[in-house]
Amino acid sequence: MYSAISEKISETITLQRQTSSRYIEFFVFRNVDINELWTTDISEDKTHDVWPAVNKKSFKKFLENELTSYQRPIPLLGIPQNGTVSKTCKKEKQRETDCVNYERKHGNPVTFYPRHRAKRNANTDTCISEEPSILVSHHRNSKMDVFMDTNKITLVNRELIWVPHDQVRIVKLDISLYIPDGFFGVITGHSNDVFCECVTEIITDETDISVFLMNLSEHSLMLLPGDVEFSINFLPCYIPEPWEMINLSPPEFAIFHLKASREFIAKPNSYTIQYFDAMYVCADELKALMIPSKEIAKLGLLIETYIWNKDTIPSIKIFNSTRKTIYIPTGICIARIIFTCGHFCLSLMPERAINRLQVLDANSSFLFHYATSNNA
């Protein structure tokens, strides 16, 4: 058995041969070039900090003739060997077929935005993971301008947005996304008007994406073009094992739901903090992102996004932006939870009702496929 720890990602790669079936197994989770396996020598004074030396010819011959190889989906960073996966990893040819089928169906060409990064592959029969590929379909009659960076999508309103007083405005972004397996998107928004709050949203594979705008003032708001900006960042998701979760129900499409264990009330124009008897004991690199549920947002309750760390119980900060007392019954979903290895922080906003979530993963890159659509 050979075992090494990559200097790039601090993940273990194991090559194991079983005499019965001559089976070899390896796991690659991020930027890993398999060719380094047989190009780097290991000395006695170094203990598992570089790749081991392997005979290239004999190893390739073994792969081609006497081996059934399997590679776990690369986007699922750190997932246990017997963990639960909500989606399957598609082959590169299948992703190309999806783009061709989309063009035939909608009659619109697909624009490619290449990103330069080394390929990660093992052998021709395994799932080859290229740049994470994201298909963006922008409706022609959209009220949003779309800008694509190396690692995120930015949307800015190009028309007026009316936000009524004491109501929640649901704004359609007029885009559809095809997110690759093992990834999810998080939408963060910012408005130039201090009385307008944008509710953070998470998406997995959406065709009708919308966000919530809350009016905290005593009169209606008219947001001018360019006043609202939404950023969609993409991060790898993770599904913990059942024994790593305490008092959490099974997930739906990698998303857990945090429900109220007891009833409570939210007084008008005031804050309340609710604690929940839940905990998780996953790896240190993982954290849970708690996003307000749509049921709570429709009631006019503003929930601050919470970064939930391991071995702690979550607390939710709720602000009632209405002028009436809101009763929250037992069992209603307060927040949605998704586990990731991404990096976040809460930017302090003294002039705002809640702090703003900021995604710090700026080094990741994606391959965006852009197309226009005639859908309304």
Swiss-Prot record:
Q: Which cofactor does it need?
A: Mg(2+)
Q: Which UniProt keywords apply?
A: Hydrolase, Magnesium, Metal-binding, Nucleotide metabolism
Q: Recorded E.C. number(s)?
A: 3.6.1.23
Q: Write out the catalysed reaction.
A: dUTP + H2O = dUMP + diphosphate + H(+)
User: What one GO molecular function would you report for this record?
Assistant: dUTP diphosphatase activity
**Taxonomic superkingdom:** Viruses
Q: Which family does it belong to?
A: Belongs to the dUTPase family.
What name does UniProt use for this protein? Answer: Deoxyuridine 5'-triphosphate nucleotidohydrolase
Q: What is the lineage of its organism?
A: Viruses, Duplodnaviria, Heunggongvirae, Peploviricota, Herviviricetes
